[in-house]
Regions:
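Short glycine-enriched, charge-decorated loop/helix-capping segments at active-site entrances
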Residues: 55, 195-201, 269-277
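N-terminal pre-triad scaffold of radical SAM enzymes
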Residues: 9-63, 80-89
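Class I S-adenosyl-L-methionine
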Residues: 98, 119, 213, 286-289, ...
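Auxiliary Fe-S-binding modules of radical SAM enzymes
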Residues: 1-21, 225-303
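Conserved AdoMet/S-adenosylmethionine-binding subsite of the radical SAM
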Residues: 112-261, 266-267
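Iron-sulfur cluster-binding cysteine motifs and their immediate structural context
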Residues: 37-44, 63-82, 92-108
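Extended, non-globular alpha-helical segments
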Residues: 53-59, 106-121
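Hydrophobic packing within well-folded, soluble alpha/beta domains
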Residues: 36, 58, 64, 68, ...
């Protein structure tokens, strides 16, 4: 396989206690075939670097407006404003900003560069930690992800793949099979509703989960529960029945809605669609958890 594969990455988290077993390094690739209404990582949707503007850090110097070749940055003498209908993410403004109010989501790494970064973390992985590669959607860059998994496994590093399951390539399916652990998102059982809320139907996602399950290798299911979208009683019960029929599911992570992604939407100049959605109470979260526990599943809230 080629050794000069490159992919855009928007975050690398060292010393994570989520996204799999033990202490992990989690890599977030930039680009996803889904566009979920409730996405908490909107910077992971596009496959190219994007301008990040944190207006709270802007000191109103106007230097960015003077260097923007597109005229996409307006300055009113106090603050800068980015016109996203004009901005083409050329990033010419970055060096002009003295406060890093203008920054970038995403940069390219080769497999070698990424592996050297995570290899340094081996000492704190211990017996049950390792590396998780997700996104965005890691299998959107199937050759890169597969090669990275191979490199980690050759170094005896435990690998986890975090995936939405919408995998259409042979290399992506090989990565799904090869990873020591798969964290698999299930967003809904009704395909029409799934298409409305994520942009794609769910038949491929269900098929690929059954494929991974047939290999008798570890799976953690991740369930985003969003009021008005995925929390209907019929969807929850059908999901619980489906998961209970699988043989390789080690845990189900119930992920109640949160608002941690709100700032990222502001930084990208995008509307935050679920801003008005209410949060669950702790008692409601426990009731959601019990739906899956009643089917004999090992369940936790968060993860």
């Amino acid at each position: 396989m080629e050794k000069n594969l490159r992919a855009p990455i928007f975050n690398i988290v060292h010393g994570s206690f989520v996204d799999g077993w033990g202490t992990r390094t989690t890599v977030f690739l930039k680009g996803c075939p889904l566009c979920c209404v409730w996405c908490c990582n909107p910077e992971g949707q596009k496959t190219t670097p994007e301008l990040k503007f944190t207006q709270a850090d802007c000191i109103g110097c106007g230097k960015c407006a003077s260097v923007c070749p597109q005229g996409a940055i307006q300055w009113d003498g106090k603050l800068a404003f980015v016109d996203r209908t004009i901005c083409n993410d050329c990033l010419a403004c970055l060096d002009a900003c003295p406060t890093n109010a203008l920054d970038v989501f995403g940069m390219y790494y080769s497999v070698d560069e990424l592996f050297r970064l995570v290899e340094c973390d081996q000492d704190y992985f211990g017996d049950n930690g390792g590396v998780t590669i997700g996104g965005g959607e890691a299998t959107f860059f199937p050759d890169f992800t597969l090669e990275f998994i191979h490199r980690c496994q050759q170094a005896y590093i435990h690998t986890a793949l975090d995936t939405c399951g919408y995998i259409l390539t042979d290399a992506g399916l090989e990565a799904l099979a090869q990873a020591d652990l798969v964290l698999y998102d299930i967003k809904g059982m009704d395909s029409d509703a799934h298409r409305r809320y994520t942009g794609v139907p769910n038949e491929v996602i269900r098929k690929n989960l059954l494929y991974r399950d047939s290999l008798h290798k570890d799976i953690i299911i991740r369930l985003p529960i969003i009021p008005g979208y995925t929390d209907s009683q019929s969807n929850l019960l059908e999901t619980a029945d489906f998961l209970a029929s699988l043989k390789s599911v080690r845990r189900v992570d119930v992920l109640p809605v949160h608002k941690y992604g709100a700032l990222k939407y502001e930084q990208l100049g995008k509307p935050y669609i679920i801003g008005g959605v209410r949060l669950y109470t702790p008692e409601e979260e426990q009731r959601l958890k019990s739906i899956f526990e009643q089917k004999g599943l090992n369940v936790q809230i968060g993860g």
